[in-house]
Amino acid sequence: MMAGEKGIPFILHIPMEAKRYVGDKNALVRVGMPPDLIRMSVRNAFWSLPGAVGVNNHQGSHATEDLRAMEAVMKELAAEGVFFLDSRTSGSSIAYSVALEKDVPAARNQVFLDHYDEGGFIWSQFEKAFAIARRNGGVIAICHARPGTLDFLPRLYEIAPEDIKFVTVPEYLEHKRIGSWEE
């Protein structure tokens, strides 16, 4: 059974052109593509997996720095009525700011949890995320479906501090919008 069928919100992980793979034909969003083609690629991604509540970028260090590409992506996301989560694969990404300019709800990744697929590293990244959440009232942290990560995540609820609440990205964005957590 798919996440959407269980009522679990899910997002599309859209391949975008990376600096180290410039010209990669597998990227749905590439610098230099006509805006209409970018919009069609994003629209087709939604048609292929209906029910997605948002999008984040897979790779995309090149594409997320390009204004024309990001404007086309955000125009389509606005039409779909979904959010954008900037994976922050580039410190120079403009995706988040373009999303906000286009009235697309948006958030930014703040912690990569599993740059190394090893439990000790993943836990240290969670501790970093917990500290940011306590300081800022919330944090976005992302990970991959890697063996070490998938082994670690089920144990997280048992070992996480009691003052930490895990929420979905839509819940995070709602908190950001209204400025407080709904109990």
Question: Language-model segments: what does each one mean?
Answer:
Residues 77-91, 145-183:
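C-terminal domain-boundary segment and adjacent tail
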Residues 1-26:
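Active-site beta->alpha N-cap acidic-glycine motif
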Residues 10-14, 53-57, 84-87, 106-109, ...:
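Hydrophobic faces of well-ordered beta-strands that scaffold small-molecule active sites
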Residues 6-8, 74-83, 100-107:
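Glycine-enriched alpha-helix->loop->beta-strand junction motifs that scaffold or abut catalytic
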Residues 40-63, 136-138, 142:
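Active-site groove signature of glycoside hydrolases
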Residues 56-80, 85-88:
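Basic- and aromatic-lined ligand-binding clefts that recognize polyanionic substrates
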Residues 24-47, 63-69, 96-133:
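Alpha-helical scaffold elements lining the catalytic groove of polysaccharide deacetylases
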Residues 16-20, 60-64, 90-92, 112-115, ...:
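Solvent-exposed loop/turn segments at secondary-structure junctions
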